[in-house]
């Protein structure tokens, strides 16, 4: 199913089956996709919020397994409780979106799980990722400034060329992450575990300057 150049306003798509559907250059304003089946669905150049609006679309408890959003406006969207395993978000504006309770993990047992997500080149400023598991995922070239990452674990993920706010360091797990080409201002190595983290040579100076050390 291919849909192009359509506008939907206040439509209730709850519990609808959009599996494998493709939407291109479509606009969705104040629409609900709660509990919808969006597995393997593709959204390209779509908008999910009107200009200057304060409320986006809702994907709460939707099945977004392996769904793909490319160059989409998803600001203020709600993804609470959604199945986001394998979700792909490329070059999207997600400012203020809420992912609290979203699931990016496949649990093999109570203690074993693996995550899958491809979130790259996105505006994630002021998003809510509180306590979200995003381990060993592609998360590079994103803007995370002001996002709520409290209790989240991004362990082992590629965070290269991302942007963070100084106050965010220490609120989430970055062990074994790729932090190359990331500004590390505000990161205190005394309280943030950098076990297995990758950085560039020039980043050493940022980490050690607060201690009065000069890197030659």
Swiss-Prot record:
Coiled coil: none
One Pfam assignment: Pentapeptide
Keyword vocabulary terms for this entry: Antibiotic resistance
GO biological process assignments: response to antibiotic
TM annotation in the entry: none
Cross-referenced InterPro entries: 5peptide_repeat (IPR001646), Pentapeptide-BTB/POZ_domain (IPR051082)
Repeat found in the keyword field: no
Function: Has no effect when overexpressed in E.coli. When Cys-115 is mutated to Tyr and overexpressed it increases (fluoro)quinolone resistance in E.coli up to 16-fold for ciprofloxacin, levofloxacin and nalidixic acid.
Family: Belongs to the pentapeptide repeat protein family.
Protein's recorded name: Pentapeptide repeat protein VPA0095
């Amino acid at each position: 199913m291919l849909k192009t150049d359509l506008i939907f306003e206040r439509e209730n798509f709850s519990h609808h089956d959009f599996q494998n559907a493709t939407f291109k250059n479509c606009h969705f304003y104040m629409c609900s996709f709660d509990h919808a089946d969006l597995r393997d669905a593709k959204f390209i150049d779509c908008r999910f919020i009107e200009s200057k609006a304060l409320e986006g679309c809702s994907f709460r408890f939707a099945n977004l397994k392996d769904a793909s959003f490319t160059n989409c406006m998803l600001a203020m969207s709600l993804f609470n409780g959604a199945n986001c395993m394998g979700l792909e978000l490329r070059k999207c504006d997600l400012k203020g979106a809420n992912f609290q309770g979203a699931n990016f993990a496949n649990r093999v047992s109570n203690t074993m799980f693996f995550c899958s997500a491809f979130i790259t080149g996105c505006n994630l400023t002021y998003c809510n990722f509180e306590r979200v598991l995003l381990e060993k995922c592609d998360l590079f070239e994103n803007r995370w400034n002001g996002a709520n990452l409290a209790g989240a674990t991004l362990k082992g993920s590629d965070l290269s060329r991302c942007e963070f706010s100084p106050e965010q360091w220490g609120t989430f797990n970055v062990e074994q992450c790729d932090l190359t080409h990331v500004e590390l201002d505000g990161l205190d190595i005394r309280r943030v575990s950098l076990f297995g983290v990758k950085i560039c040579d020039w980043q050493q100076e940022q980490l050690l300057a607060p201690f009065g050390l000069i890197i030659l």
